Amino acid sequence: MQFAAPLVPGRLVQRYKRFLADIDTDDGRVTVHCPNPGAMLGLNAPGARVLLSRSSNPARKLPLTWELVEAELPGGAQWVGINTQRPNALVAEAFRAGAIAALAGHDALRPEVRYAEASRVDFLASGAEAGPCHVEVKNCHLMRRAGLAEFPDCKAARSARHMRDLAQVVADGGRALVVIVVQMRAEAFDVARDIDPAFDRAFREARAAGVAVRAYRCAVGPEGVAIAEEIPVITPP
């Protein structure tokens, strides 16, 4: 996914109220939209280099959106995508390119399909002989050990519910896949069980029930973000 226009560089002053950040740019200090509800551990250090996209919508109160941060992570500095609204589009793009091996044989992705009393699945993949597949996408940008991506970075009750709902899909004879989009360089994925033991339990139970899980690292840079390759999920049973 290429950014539509060159990103605006800046330096992070502070992130606050979860969805707001103050950024110093060449044109002065601005308040921007921070499209991330998580803790952003290791990604919100004051003074960090950031890159912002500009909306063409004149009605937007905050025309700039925080997209990337150059974070000092274990293993060295790297660009990290912090926009949690991007992963679904990244998965759709990779699906069209045939880069999601777990969805080989499917020919269509329908977004936002209701499948449980209080849940919507991100995509319903169809067209395969094996039948439709419920696809849930999770954004990941936590790294506390070099090369190891983790999720979640805060309590994730909603994500735990998604795992339970997907396990029920499989129990009812359906198919389900969780795609973890890692918006940074990483070599493997694991659950941050110390941050949210309840999600860890739901994740393990869903896998044991037959929910497939695949993790993909992204190539991230000022020009764009794209799914690059699958990485192993090392969470034990």
From Swiss-Prot:
<dbReference type="InterPro" id="IPR041465">
    <property type="entry name" value="SfsA_N"/>
</dbReference>
<protein>
    <recommendedName>
        <fullName>Sugar fermentation stimulation protein homolog</fullName>
    </recommendedName>
</protein>
<comment type="similarity">
    <text>Belongs to the SfsA family.</text>
</comment>
<dbReference type="GO" id="GO:0003677">
    <property type="term" value="F:DNA binding"/>
</dbReference>
<dbReference type="Pfam" id="PF17746">
    <property type="entry name" value="SfsA_N"/>
</dbReference>
<dbReference type="InterPro" id="IPR005224">
    <property type="entry name" value="SfsA"/>
</dbReference>
<dbReference type="Pfam" id="PF03749">
    <property type="entry name" value="SfsA"/>
</dbReference>
<dbReference type="InterPro" id="IPR040452">
    <property type="entry name" value="SfsA_C"/>
</dbReference>
